[in-house]
Regions:
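RNase H-like nuclease fold core
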Residues: 1-42, 46, 53-54
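RNase H catalytic domain
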Residues: 8-14, 49-123
Length: 123
């Protein structure tokens, strides 16, 4: 089952501010969107973590399915996949995502923003 996460925060990437996090599961017609305060990278991690928490608390919806998670954050995808350095301040968020991987088997891949349906997730 394909799942997508997305985050957007206006302004300078390393300056905390109000952003939007979202995820969607097109096959189940589920979308989620919420506000989150943090840097751009923290917002991107928050979107991934919100999706993984949803999967974790709804195991019957995903029973017997291969979970493919897609995000347009090159950094988050590659940090969680151990292919890119993760800054110290983001390591707790990365650790949470890796912790979910130990509970929920999922594949994490990058997708171009234009192909990410989570960017248009409805409230």
């Amino acid at each position: 089952m394909r799942c997508y996460f997305y985050a957007q925060k206006p302004g300078a990437p390393d300056t905390p501010g109000d952003g939007t996090v979202s995820f969607c599961l097109p096959e189940l017609n589920i979308s989620f969107r919420a506000r989150y305060r943090g840097t751009s990278a923290a917002c991107e991690y928050a979107a991934l973590l919100a999706l993984l928490e949803f999967v974790d608390i709804n195991p019957k919806m995903f029973e017997g399915k291969t979970l493919e998670v897609f995000g347009d954050s090159f950094a988050v995808v590659n940090q969680v996949n151990d292919r890119l350095y993760c800054r110290k301040e983001l390591q707790p968020l990365r650790s949470m995502a890796v912790g979910y991987r130990n509970k929920i088997p999922f594949i994490l891949n990058w997708v171009p923003t234009a192909e990410n349906p989570a960017q248009g997730a409805e409230l």
